[in-house]
Regions:
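The feature captures the beta-strand-to-loop junction immediately N-terminal to the Walker
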Residues: 64-66
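Conserved catalytic motifs of ABC-family nucleotide-binding domains
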Residues: 186
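Catalytic Walker B motif of ABC-type/P-loop ATPase nucleotide-binding domains
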Residues: 190-194
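ABC ATPase nucleotide-binding domains
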Residues: 265-291
């Protein structure tokens, strides 16, 4: 578990309840679960039990939990690349797993932990691919497409990287460009799987602060998978806390961040206090039993 402290927003809901009820809801995750069978002779294994929450345009939801807790499974269910065993995920009222590949690519942008380059490309060319994420062949791009790609780079503070080759970029620079490609899709829903992986502390804070501004300014609904307690606490509107496939709590960070609960989930002695921003800040402390 990484404890990143960034520099110096509700009532608790049970996992079975929807966290908000509002006509402006864009994303609705309703009692979603998932299981798989390792082989035909074994009973299905639950990787995610019933989970529910809602999110509006302009909000950031953090899916928080230790490794192998079901976070990435939930993200794939939201993206529609996995079909739920039960429940449903609705984007503007439509089940995401029922969307065609083209429609899904137009409405949902996904930033994976690792994005592989299929061929050498400059940063702006890589971002330009986001204009036609469902396409499988190269095509001539319009002036509008190019302008959107350039603007996406500017939105993430990477305009100066446009003409550089992707292979030359540092980890933080590459992550900005990958995010810009997702923004170039102009999606309704932006999904990120551990976007701060391999980034130093300053780059992690910078990325999440940028996401906060982008969500508000462009009315994106953002769902980010992370194990970074302080980043989620500082920048997320809601936190979905998961452990071993079970959704333990959903709500604002100030509601979810209860010391005993976090210690149970992360198996570490912790302290929780309010930071300068009024949001919870978590620190690792010496084992209270002196072990």
């Amino acid at each position: 578990m990484s404890m990143v402290a960034p520099p110096a927003v509700g009532a608790m809901r049970s996992p079975g309840e929807v966290s908000r009820v509002n006509n402006d809801v864009r994303l609705s995750v309703e009692q979603v679960s998932y299981a798989y069978s390792p082989n035909l002779t074994q009973a299905p294994l639950f990787t995610l039990e019933a989970t529910s929450f809602q999110a509006r345009a302009g909000e950031i939801v953090a899916i928080l939990g230790p490794n192998a807790s079901g976070k990435s499974t939930l993200l794939k269910l939201i993206a529609g690349t996995l079909e739920p065993l039960s429940g449903k995920v609705l984007l503007n009222g439509f089940p995401t797993h029922s969307l065609t590949a083209r429609t899904r690519a137009q409405r949902i942008a996904m930033v994976q932990q690792e994005s592989q380059l299929l061929f050498p490309a400059r940063a702006w060319e890589f971002v330009l691919q986001g204009r036609h994420p469902h396409g499988r062949t190269l095509r001539f791009e319009s002036a509008t497409d190019i302008a959107v790609a350039r603007n996406a780079l500017a939105q993430v503070g990477a305009a100066q990287l446009g003409d550089r080759w992707m292979a030359e970029l540092s980890g933080g620079e590459k992550q900005r460009v990958i995010l810009a490609r997702a923004l170039a899709q102009q999606p309704l829903l932006l999904l990120l799987d551990e976007p701060t992986l391999h980034l130093d502390i300053a780059a992690q804070v910078d990325l999440l602060l940028g996401l906060r501004h982008l969500a508000v300014e462009n009315r994106y609904t953002v769902v980010v998978v992370t194990h970074e307690l302080n980043l989620a606490g500082e920048y997320a509107d809601q936190v979905v806390l998961i452990q071993r496939g079970k959704c333990l709590r959903v709500g604002p960070p100030g509601v979810v961040y209860q010391r005993e609960l976090l210690e149970q989930v992360f198996q570490t002695a912790l302290s929780v206090e309010l930071g300068p921003s009024g949001r919870p800040r978590v620190n690792v402390v010496a084992d209270r039993e002196g072990r």
